Design a protein with these regions (language model features):
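Residue(s) in the substrate-gating loop at a strand-loop-helix junction
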Residues: 147
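C-terminal helical subdomain
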Residues: 187-188, 207-253
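The beta1-alpha1 cofactor-binding region of Rossmann-like NAD(H)/NADP(H)-dependent oxidoreductases
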Residues: 63-74, 107
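Active-site helix of classical SDR
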Residues: 125, 163
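Substrate-binding pocket helix/loop in short-chain dehydrogenase/reductase
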Residues: 100-102, 109-114
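Alpha-helical segment proximal to the catalytic Tyr-Lys
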Residues: 130, 176-177
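Conserved glycine-rich cofactor-binding loop
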Residues: 17-19
């Protein structure tokens, strides 16, 4: 929680209209941050803002398509105009793809997943870095949303798995290249939080051995608190990688 003698820190959350992004945005607001809510669709973003209750006055809704460089530039320009700086980027926006064999995956679907999960994350990180280097005081923190799929794939998930492995490379490169500018970069790898994206797990999901089984899920609030705790560290300390998951979910080798 921020103290009264400190100006509120500024966080930007992509994919803030639903799921993990919404939960993290609400947690930041509850901890006293000013929060920029970014996502493709205005209505879910507005629902997130309203859900913040008394904290909603510190939320700014900015509809954004992270796959478009101009849209991302406008997002960060609006953040700077409204708040003058950026302390934390939660680089969260992402999407999956239908579970099909590799040879049946349309290249258009592959490109859409890469555009959102990797290029979109790069564009947001790039814009955040430019702002964090220019602001006074300099620096800030970037937290990238990885996945258990950054460690081990699910069956028929090549596009999602490949992009999440690539996010790990993005995190490492940002950490190396930007640490001397006061910018810390870490990654949180999340497994089976209760969101719309994981609803299918309650009905059963394909396993590596070919069976279909229900998988346990955890409260998304645990993820939100973990991200906010990562963000709360001073910039001379960094959680480089964190894995948070439902305790009994399949993980190593997805077994």
């Amino acid at each position: 929680m921020q103290t009264n003698d400190q100006p509120p820190k500024v966080a930007l959350v992509t994919g803030a209209g639903t799921g993990i992004g919404r939960a993290v945005a609400l947690e930041f607001l509850a901890r006293g941050y000013r929060v920029v809510l970014a996502g493709r669709r205005p209505e879910p973003l507005e629902h997130t803002r309203v859900a913040a209750g008394d904290d909603s006055a510190r939320a700014l809704v900015v509809p954004t398509d992270v796959t478009r460089e101009t849209s991302v530039r406008e997002l960060f320009d609006e953040t700077q105009r409204a708040y003058g700086r950026l302390d934390v980027l939660f680089n969260n926006a992402g999407r999956g793809a239908p579970a099909v064999p590799i040879e049946e995956l349309p290249v258009e679907t592959w490109r859409e997943v890469v555009d959102t999960n990797l290029t979109g994350m790069f564009l947001c990180a790039q814009a955040a870095i430019r702002l964090m280097k220019a602001q006074n005081p300099r620096g800030g923190r970037i937290i990238n949303n990885g996945s258990i799929s950054a460690h081990a794939p699910r069956p028929y998930s090549i596009a999602y798995t490949a992009t999440k492995h690539a996010v790990t490379g993005l995190t490492k490169s940002i950490s190396l290249d930007c640490r001397n500018d006061g910018i810390a970069c870490g990654q949180i790898d999340i497994g089976n939080a209760v969101t719309e994206m994981t609803d299918r797990m309650a009905a059963g999901i394909l396993q590596a051995d070919g069976s279909t089984r229900v998988e346990p899920r955890m409260d998304v609030g645990h993820v939100a608190k973990a991200v906010a705790d990562m963000a709360a560290l001073p910039l001379d300390a960094n959680v480089q990688f964190m894995t948070i998951m439902a305790t009994t979910m399949p993980f190593v080798g997805r077994g």
